[in-house]
Amino acid sequence: MEFPTLPSWAIKKNYLWHSNPESRPVCRTYFDKCIIRPKLDIAWSIVKGEKEGDKDQASTQITKYTNDAAKMTAGRVVQTLIDDYRIHNKADTIEDCIDAGKEIFAKYKPKTWDDGKDEAQLDICMNSFADVFKNALQGLDEAQNKMRINKLEGERNYMFGVPGLDLEYNGKPDFNGQIELKTTWATYSKVISSGRRSASLPSQPSWSHLCQVAGYWAYKQDPQAIVYANEKGYRVFTEENCEKLAPEALKNIWNHIVAKCRIRENQLKSAQTVHELIQLVEPDFSHMFAWDIHPEVLKEAKQLWGFVQ
């Protein structure tokens, strides 16, 4: 297998491939790929003993820069349980899966800097994940039937070249390269008497999720389905009930993605350093979730863009 030679302008900035450009603002992507990940790589190499350094300090750095959350963990739990139950045959019953899910949740350490918000969110997710899991299974069954997939297969790793781009494009479809699962969770709220705001199922797929599956479609032109599941039910979208999942629509979305990736490559090429690259984009610190990170890391980002001293 031959690996493509990466251009120096990409290596210098640790921006080695493209992925869905609509998953978060470009400012957050640059900060993560070009600033945070190199620091995490060094910290992990110290912790693993591959590089000399202070292991305690490295562990502290990993904790600070690793931006996990209760909802993200809950989504991974459901995905893992489905893989174990439907694909790898590691669990005999749904009850076994639920017990395994509780063990995974027990390993998660909530954020310590958000006044208990993530800890409260974790309780909500733990109390509802069994229902979300069961509904996700039903939604997956329906999607598998609609897509006429005989044998369910797990996550794939797509890495492919794109005409007009110097860097490859990466995507990881959940099932068979054709079915994407999205779980939605009730949200903790201290202003609601119950302490939680229910999550509804969407009437149409989100733009970000459409862009995500358009990347999978671009690789093999296989039909795509998106399954949404919450604690109350599920909803399956295919081209039968969502025109934006039709081939022509996915092609148009893919063209949009490639255009945005091309703009990023132009920025990466024109900037001599990571600092210059950062200065080429306007940060959106008011984004609803992109900058929900450790206060010290947020301050670091604002300093890079010159918003604070």
Predicted regions span which residues?
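Short acidic (Asp/Glu) and glycine-rich catalytic loops that position anionic groups and cofactors
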Residues: 54-61, 183, 231-235
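Short amphipathic alpha-helical face segments that pack within enzyme cores
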Residues: 77, 211-218
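Short loop/turn segments at secondary-structure transitions that flank enzyme active sites
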Residues: 84, 185-187, 230-232
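Metal-dependent nuclease catalytic regions and adjoining charged, substrate-binding loops involved
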Residues: 154, 218-309
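Non-catalytic protein-protein interaction segments used by genome-maintenance enzymes to assemble
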Residues: 158-212
